[in-house]
Amino acid sequence: MREKLKLYYLCRFTQLSPLRLSGGKNDRTDNDLMLDSRGLPMIPGSALAGVLRSRLTREDADLLFGKNTVGNDMTESAVLVGDAALPAGAKVRFTHRDGVGLDERKIAIPKAKYDFETAECSVPYTAVIEWSGWSDDPALPLLDALLAGAAADGLAFGGRTTRGYGRMAADVCKKAFHFPADVDAWLAFDSDDVNSFADATPVVG
């Protein structure tokens, strides 16, 4: 039977290598990390969505995340991707590293040295991804498969990922609410509280 659904995926990302995700500022280095209001590194939802979208074909990405066009061809995403944040009090090691600009032949450019900031933390970053739609929506199996693949392969965020930066292991679990049967449980659910996912179903690849 066709049902209205709301799905919540709790994603935990554990660093396997230093993170270099620029916030566009250069107060501390030539390329500062993106930090939240608490001064902790974060992965914005737009960056997480972009990494996930890149794992799909264009057709599947448009179906799941909407079309990035204008006018009548634009479609809205059924997926809401939250920021991946560290818990309060997480201990982070910040490091300033040196780099050098390269030309098109990968040869160092004279006087093109720069520095950038990286972060290392053993505590997982946590993000929530929300999906709303009907049980027969063709985008639904795409999202499950996408996040199962992320859990199996891990993801990489930020700059210099081809050099090994930003690699993270992913652990994903899911809470599903069927309407109208689960309306009371959904009203009592708090997606911002990780304890609300205590009985969530693991998403595995």
For the regions a protein language model found, what residue spans apply to each?
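Small/polar/charged residue-enriched interaction surfaces, especially the RNA/DNA-contacting tracks
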Residues: M1-G205
